[in-house]
Design a protein with these regions (language model features):
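Conserved short alpha-helical segments that host acidic/polar catalytic motifs at enzyme active sites
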Residues: 1-211
Length: 211
């Protein structure tokens, strides 16, 4: 099954919140997640820089931290959402305003923008999407051993059924692996790269994986 880019949040079985992002792509598979100065960006792999001329949407910050919140998205919405949350705006409003302002991507597929935000202290998670036909944002309570997700295609609403009830990750490297081939994600096709932030005692630890 191919469902495009995936954002997810969850809580490990020992109670640590986690945000995850996975690039699944048919058209532009030559990408990688790179950590730099406390954030993670999606960039072309060496030798594939020319892909940016074909599609400007394929490179962006995909994961950032704002205080107690970890923000994962599939596009340039990462930055305004993070900045609004850092300025004190409620998470729901920061997601909604940023998605409305940027709208869906104006590529050949009208690709939706998706967002997952998780709180280290609040024990809350949010999923959001802007599609050509809708803007949807929803808040969830975190549950140990559970991850929720939304994707650009197919699983493209913050619905109860898009859930993994056996989620666990011992560390950030385990989280990036899980969103590629763990639980419900194992049967999703065309993994390219992934990123994750998992809560620690004093913040979040970041991890990346190239498939």
């Amino acid at each position: 099954m191919y469902i495009g880019r995936i954002v997810a949040f969850g809580m490990t079985k020992d109670g640590r919140p986690c945000a995850m992002y996975r690039v699944s792509s048919r058209s532009f598979p030559n990408r990688r997640a790179v950590e730099n100065q406390g954030k993670i960006a999606i960039v072309p792999r060496e030798g594939a820089e020319g892909d940016l001329a074909k599609n400007p949407y394929i490179s962006y910050n995909c994961l950032r931290i704002a205080g107690e919140w970890a923000i994962a998205t599939n596009g340039s919405q990462t930055d305004p959402i993070t900045e609004k949350i850092a300025m004190g705006m409620p998470v729901r409003d920061a997601i909604t305003l940023s998605l409305l302002a940027l709208d869906y991507e104006k590529d050949s597929l009208d690709t939706p923008r998706v967002v997952a935000v998780v709180g280290r202290e609040s024990k809350k998670g949010f999923l959001g999407i802007v599609r050509k036909d809708a803007v949807l944002v929803r808040e969830f309570d975190l549950v140990p051993g559970q991850a929720r997700y939304i994707s650009t295609y197919e699983c493209n609403s913050p619905a109860d059924e898009y859930v993994d009830n056996d989620f666990d990750a011992a560390c950030e490297n385990c989280a990036v692996q899980y969103v590629v081939n763990g639980g419900v994600f194992a049967n999703i096709e065309n993994p390219v790269t992934s990123a994750a932030a998992i809560a620690t005692d004093d913040g979040f630890a970041l991890g990346t994986l190239i498939c």
